Amino acid sequence: LASVVKHWLKLFNNVNCFFSEDYYIFYKSLKNLYYFWSMMVSRDNGEAPNVDDKFGLEWTNEVATDWKAAAVKRGYWVDPFIYWFQQPKQNILRFPEMLRGYYARVKGIRIVVEQFLDKFAPACQIINFGAGFDTMYWNLSKEGRQIDLYLEIDLPDVVRKKINCILRHSSDLYSFACNEQLQMLIDRNDVMHTLNYHIMAGDLCNTDDLMEKFLSIPIDFSKPTLFLSECVLVYVNVDRTKNLLQMLSNKFAKACFLDYEPSNLNSIFGRKFLENMAQMKVSVSGASFCESVDSMRQIYEESGWSNFKSWKVSAVYLNSLPRQDRERVETLDLLDDPEMLNQMLDHYLFSVATNSDDQNLISIGFE
């Protein structure tokens, strides 16, 4: 049964089946059945679930999107576009610590993005690695923020699903000029190009392939460029991460890399994170990269990023997020144990690295 379900999942991933809501629901049901069957068989055998890395990494995107949608629904922040990609699942216990953690994550990233745009927009670029169902571009556009180029790169299946989700809401999009353009996008279901927004499937472990993707769109390697990465490099082999960082540092004249990752993976919390990923058969190939601040700093500096700074998310939450909004959020859900939130946020880091001595770039970061 599991092999039959997996065959149908692959078929659905390779055709444009998401324009009908019924097909989409059917796909989700198949996927849930596959996970359930894998979990049941593995439990009976006393093993971790037999879910391959590809589905496991897709799962991390869907989980993150679901938590973000739940936080938006609770009023933690405003994001009218999150529901394009995920409706929060009903009747699921939502731990306030997790909702608060996603609030710190989203708001922290937004602070850095706004700093970058305030200094360089519109003649600048943002490239989001492992973007998943991120909605940053749509929110920036809604607010009238101008940018020359915004590129998202992720796994082929994730990109296909995101494009189809966007096309299902095409009547809401002012970015698309005509039906002919939409038809072109349907024909190429793992690539989408608009005037300044691009989304493509790409392999971060293959820098030659990535460079081909860059050259296929109007990227300007001389313009200030902000790279975004949220819980991505922790899943990438450390040598591949070095190759990626070196290529970016060499090709882009003025670049800033904002990374959000788990850290201190040798702690009890870190070992639990690794255990959970192992149970889902997701390879945490970048565990040594995220082992500590020093390990991250060393890899960035060896890869050509001479200016590296990092902050625990707990410090950003307390010292850098707008106080009035933080106090508002803290009234939405009361914490049984505030120390649990602090411990969780202590094990995640924001890091900002630059490959240029440009003071506008170096000044980007948190207080």
Identify the function of each model-found stretch.
Residues 7, 11:
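Cationic, low-complexity basic patches in intrinsically disordered or flexible, solvent-exposed regions
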Residues 16-18, 22-200, 208, 215-217, ...:
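Rossmann-like AdoMet
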Residues 95, 167, 240, 248-254, ...:
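Plant-skewed but cross-kingdom recognition/interaction modules and surfaces
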Residues 209-213, 235-247:
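A short, conserved alpha-helix within the catalytic core of class I
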Residues 225-238:
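A short SAM/SAH-binding and catalytic strip from SAM-dependent methyltransferases
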Residues 234, 262-267:
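Short "lid" loop at the C-terminus of a central beta-strand within the Rossmann-like core
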Residues 252-262:
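Conserved beta-strand signature within the Rossmann-like core of class I S-adenosyl-L-methionine
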Residues 268-367:
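Rossmann-like AdoMet/SAM-dependent catalytic core
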